[in-house]
């Protein structure tokens, strides 16, 4: 009997690495789809191997940096889109694109279902599922964090770490570093674990893309950004593609300690994060 195919939005992190294995145990032929959205911290080759070790029938990695910046990031910058006046929406912008690519892969591979690793408490479940159904109203959505057999047995990161250890799934997270991260060209964000305590400041080593303003150059650096029809196209006379331009500006800003935000977010479901 052929197994039903399922396309999982795969980041290579703790949650989705465990989900690859768990979904395979439920009888699905898991196709793990990881999109390259410009994440510098993650090793995509390592993610490929990790997905295979976790039990994926296929691990697909697709570079969508240019599409992400051109069609999602730049419009949000033009709109000066900030959630609650602070959050730059880096994660929010990426989810519809990830969903779109999952639906496309499901069509090519003959998959009957798509899956995500979002919990029933956060915003991502809404972003993913509304996007899935908008693109394919007939697709089956598997959300393990809403399935009692999963979330009652593995309610948090401690249990997921134990699961990964039991089945030999290599993950970056640990009991000493229990937080989760999400990175793309728009941002890198950290949440969960110790960060759920609003009195707990982020640790210095968490900031992987920017140095502390205390250690940034004293002298300012002036740059000239050229725009064409509302979109940035060049810096100091040098032309870049949208993704390359944002990559360059991210590196420059990081050197000068620009871009750090610490906030408490109001979630769609009414909780704080």
Residue ranges of model-derived segments:
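Nucleotide-activated chemistry modules centered on ATP-dependent adenylation/adenylyltransferase
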Residues: 1-9, 14-273
